[in-house]
Amino acid sequence: HQGGAGATLMPGMCEAHTHFSWNDAATLAAIQTMPLEEHVLWCAKVARRYLEAGFTSCVGAACAKARLDVVIRNAINAGQIPGPRYLAASQEITVLGALGDETLPHLPFPEFSFGVNISGADEMRKAVRLFLKYGVDSIKLNLSGDNFTPQSPADTTWMLDEEVAAAMREVKIRGKRGVAHARSSESVKQALRHGIDLIYHASFVDNEALDMLEAAKDRVFVAPGIAILYAMLNEAEEFGITKQMATDMGYQIEWDAALESLSKMHKRGIRVLPGGDYGFAFTPHCQNSRDLEFFVKYLGFTPMEAIRSTTLYGGQIMMRPDELGVIKDGYLADLLLVDGDPLANLAILRDPKRILAVMKNSRSREFCVCGVKANP
């Protein structure tokens, strides 16, 4: 809705791939080794920054310690801290040697690991039940590898069907959601077979996987995280990763494959949402709306389709399609007032000076944290 003085009123945005506890570090170990007390404060600060940046809803995609997401969600809901509506995730659950296993031969202790390491269905069941006991909204499973960890590249698939089945049985009993780190084609198919409805990455997708995604498009969401691929190839040199190193790690191949796969998904009507794995040194927090620009530039979205992916689809992925994501009578007033027209220039959404006001259920910046800024 275009308003006076060239301002635009739009629904608040939704980040579909949120890691509040990623502390803008360059390695998984540097995230994991942040002491718990400082980590809680970090998450609270980042949650507030997301709201100020126009994100009134966020979907947790994994946290670095067992209860960080749950504690932050509960504090937001109780009015103790400002922040977006939040769905809390578990830590990443992984298998020995795969993405998230940061233990060392001489330090095999689980506390040293970024993810929770399991081997077999029984260990999976125990891990999932523990996170469900803590009160998470979703269980995160690392089905595929990742080029960030060269010993388990992105096109490999690590988890056994019986391990995934054990996890999803517990998830479904509690009425919660299973989400998957799934870069490989086989891991995407595995996620779909087991009823996982939120798939992160989906970089390598063959025709069979595309057909399966399309058949399940009424229940499935894909949040690809292409910002991290772009950043690793083009913006990580100051952190010791040159373009050639990133290419040797497999990022150029994955970038090319991801753009092809995600463009095909979009054309087939599969819901692709922004969520770029922000919270690393090369993808710092609160540049998240940059994903919308990438969607237009690389995936064939129109600017309006990009906006809808973070608003209309945002309400759907938050499981509140009749309350969020649209400006309409009867919906919650999660609103964003922007200086200018995002459809003409999506980049204004990541310029703090252009965010004039954020309202979460009619409360300006929640508790009037920053008030409503007026142009001089």
Whereabouts are the PLM-identified features?
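Active-site core of metal-dependent hydrolases
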Residues: 142-256, 273, 278-280, 299-301, ...
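Divalent metal-coordination and catalytic microenvironments
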Residues: 6, 14-17, 54, 86, ...
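Metal-associated gating/positioning segment near the N- to mid-region
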Residues: 7-74, 96, 162, 191-194
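Histidine-rich, glycine-flanked metal-binding segment
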Residues: 1-10, 371
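Divalent metal-dependent hydrolysis catalytic cores, especially in the metallo-beta-lactamase
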Residues: 44-72, 82-92, 136-149, 176-177, ...
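C-terminal cap of metal-dependent C-N hydrolases
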Residues: 310-312, 329-375
